[in-house]
Structure formats: C-alpha cells, structure tokens
Amino acid sequence: MSAPPAIRFGVYLPQVASSFAEIRDRVLACEAAGIDSVWFMDHLHPPGLPAVPSFEAWTLVCALAPLTSRIRLGHLVLSNSFRHPALLAKMASSLDVISGGRLDLGLGSGSYEPEHRMYGIAYESSAVRARKLAEGLDVVKRLFTEPEVTFDGEFYRLQKAVNVPKPAQKPNPPIWVGGAGGPTLRLAARFADGWNCPTYALGKLDAKLRALAAECEAVGRRPAELRKSIEAVLVTGRDEREVAAARALAERRYPGPGWGLHEGGFIGTPDEIVTRIRELAARGVDTFVFFFSDRARPETIDLFARHVLAGFR
C-alpha cells in the first residue's frame, strides 16, 4: 500500500486594497516560514467591493516569481472566460519555466456575472460555461504535452498549434479544478490533477468527496489519484482571548455563509486547528489553503508556522 500524500499548506492572499510591496512582503514571509504555496484570486474587479486597488492575477504572479525561490504560485481559480485556453497554456508554460517549475494552475468556469457585464465579457449559462471549461481544459492539457495540436470544438478551434517551451513540470503543472457542482466534479475527474473544495461547500465536504469518487470511477480513474484541497478562513491565536478577537475580525471581514467560517471552518487555538486538519486529512484532504483573518500579518504567519505547520513537518 502506498503511503498517504504529504499534507501541504497554502495561504490565500486576495490582492485587494494592498500595495504591491505589502503583497510581496507577505509572500516572502510565507516562503521564509516554510509554507508551501500562495494563491490569488482572478477578478478584474473584486466582487462586491467599491473601486479599491486590485492587481490582475497573472501580472501579479509573474512579478512575484523572480522574487521568490521555493514557494509555489497559483490562483484559486482562474476564470476560463477571461483568456483563450491556447493563450493560457502559453502563459502557464512560460511562467512554469521562468519560476523553475513552481506553478499550480487552478481553473474554473467563471462565476461572477456583474464583473463580466462590467468589462463586456460574455457570460453564458452555467451549462455553456461548463462545456467551454471542458474544452478549455482539454486544449490546455494537450498544448502542455503534445508537439502539435489541432482541435475542432464547439467553442475553440486550433490548427497545428505549437507550444514551446513546454512546462518545466512533467507532464504538466498540477491542474486544479475548483467548484462543487456536479459538472465541475465531472471535469475534475476527467482532466484535473487536483480538486479544490471552495469555502461555500465545506459543510458538504463528505458528500462532495463521495460524488467526486463516483465521477472518478465512472471514467476509470482511482479516486486516490486526484489530490484534494480545501480553502477556508482560519481563525487562531495563542489563547482563547486572542482567538475571540481574531474571530470578531473574521466575522466582519468574511461575513455570511459563503465563506465557510461556520460550515466546517477552522476556528480555535493552534492545537485545535491541528486536530481539525488531521480529521480532514484522514478523509482524504491533502492540501489546506487558508485565508487568515488578518490577511496574513507576519505575527500570524509566524504563529501558524511554529504551532501548526511544525506539527506536520
């Protein structure tokens, strides 16, 4: 029997209302602390917020790649509607080479209709977006691995397209599909190296894992081949008083059920967080991507590294 996959930890750093220097410093602090990855959003305008500064997703990670040396870089998740998949494959291959093989490629169908309207980008029905994502994933994977690609799909067409250089990671950078609906789970089983459970589905994680396993088996794939990650708000402190203060901040910053703060989230002292991680790891989750309630201030990263991360190294 093969050993269970190592548990990996990432930090989600929404690039909103922060200067580039602030984002850079927090990424470097995460790298110094031994955190495995940092993840960013892909929005042209932050959902539900006024006109606050935010950095475009790819521009940001390309700027961070040469400033870092070990930490992995990714997005949860890129919107398939923002970029043609052939262009995305070229961008991803280039960044994977530039970063020395440190890219994780998260891809989804695009979910925020007002943003699409704002920028004049077509926003089709969920069924159409799912079919487009399926074709997009197929195109990206083939351009990562094949010398020449001709593709004649419903939405995308390629004629003897080449993609050189190929990604540094072989056969491709890890591809993550994020979302919790049936069509998304089906696409993860068909195309992805990993599935990401979003915050809003944490309370239904067991049901989603069972559904994902069924989709894997339907395409002749062992469910254990697919990595599983969750993203969640993490609320912690050195003692109960600090936890209460951090929770109050998180309640203001991440209100409502969509953030998963109460639906299976992570609230407690470091020992309680470790216990919760071990519970989910036993159910098959191998990657944990956390939103810190204070947006990953250095002292919080240090606390997490010394009292949570250290328990898994």
Report each predicted region and the residues it spans.
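Active-site-adjacent structural elements that line small-molecule/cofactor binding pockets in enzymes
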Residues: 1-313
